[in-house]
Amino acid sequence: MTKGTDKNSNQMLVAHLSMFGACVGWGLMAPIGKEAMLHGVSGLSMVTFRVVGACLLFWLASLFARKEHVSRRDKLMFAGAAVFGLLLNQCCYTLGLSFTSPINASIVTTSMPIFAMLLSALILKEPITGKKALGVLMGCSGALMLILTSAAHVSDKVGDIRGDLLCLFAQFSFALYLSLFNPLIRRYNVFTINRYMFTWATIMLLPFTFGETMATVSSHLSMKTWMEVAYVVGIGTFLCYILTMVGQRALRPTVVSVYNYVQPIVSVFASLLMGVGVLKPTHALAVILVFTGVWLVNKSRARGDAK
């Protein structure tokens, strides 16, 4: 094995571990963030805490990172990336969750890798191979099996088509971000990328949510709730976006998106560890389907292989 091949293998391993780590953080963020929203933090306030808090953390981290020159054109491109990768994705999902049931919202999130596969074919000319399509289908089946069997004994409110459509658009928005801005993401380090994206998102979001967020801040939340918000901002946003960018720089958009199916696994196992869930045989089958799906998508042909 040559040094170049060995280095590339190490980069791919780091990329996959980073995506898995991000999905673990996001999977744990779901129950923790939901708990905070049940105790005084509104959905839009939570989005604002995430965006503004992560913006401040990325500016602070940038003081210790390598300085990079960013062209004026790319600065404007980061504004577009912030719209599709942050604002539309987070705001639509949060608003959708307020209309529909958590189960419906979880089911809708399984559409994102399908959108990513189709958009990558249209925009990046990535081939849709049988192996890739089978991998996405297997991952989707595993995630749906996990969500539906876990929800079988949960009393949940009826879904709402408005909320379902908003959650669906959130997935489409993030898939579009993965395909449109993939070349931009590969040009800069993770701190430069996130600093500009979260700065643009803060500028665009804060004028509309400042009043509601300040009302939340002054509402005497408990220390436990503030700790939950801190997790959502520090781990679920700051750290997870760093890990996602590391993965996105080395992996194809469809591979990045199919890791979305790992999040329900993390949520279920977190509930088992917390003693609020019961392990079922279908959980093991779902895990096998998801990780087999990720493996198949990763092994499918890339654009360069198709030439």
What is each of the regions a protein language model found here?
Residues 23-27, 81-90, 113, 147, ...:
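Transmembrane alpha-helical core positions of polytopic small-molecule transporters
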Residues 25-30, 59-109, 145, 233-251:
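Specific transmembrane alpha-helical segments of multi-pass solute transporters/efflux pumps
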Residues 58, 79, 119, 128-150, ...:
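Hydrophobic transmembrane alpha-helices of multi-pass small-molecule transport proteins
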Residues 2-49, 156-183, 203, 207, ...:
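Glycine-/small-residue-enriched transmembrane alpha-helix faces in small-molecule transporters
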Residues 46-49, 90, 104-111, 180-202, ...:
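Helix-helix packing/entry segments at the starts of transmembrane helices
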Residues 36, 46, 50, 96, ...:
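Hydrophobic/aromatic residues within transmembrane alpha-helices
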Residues 33, 38-88, 115, 173-180, ...:
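Transmembrane alpha-helices of multi-pass small-molecule transport proteins
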Residues 11-16, 40-44, 48, 70-76, ...:
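Juxtamembrane helix-entry segments on the extracytoplasmic side of multipass membrane proteins
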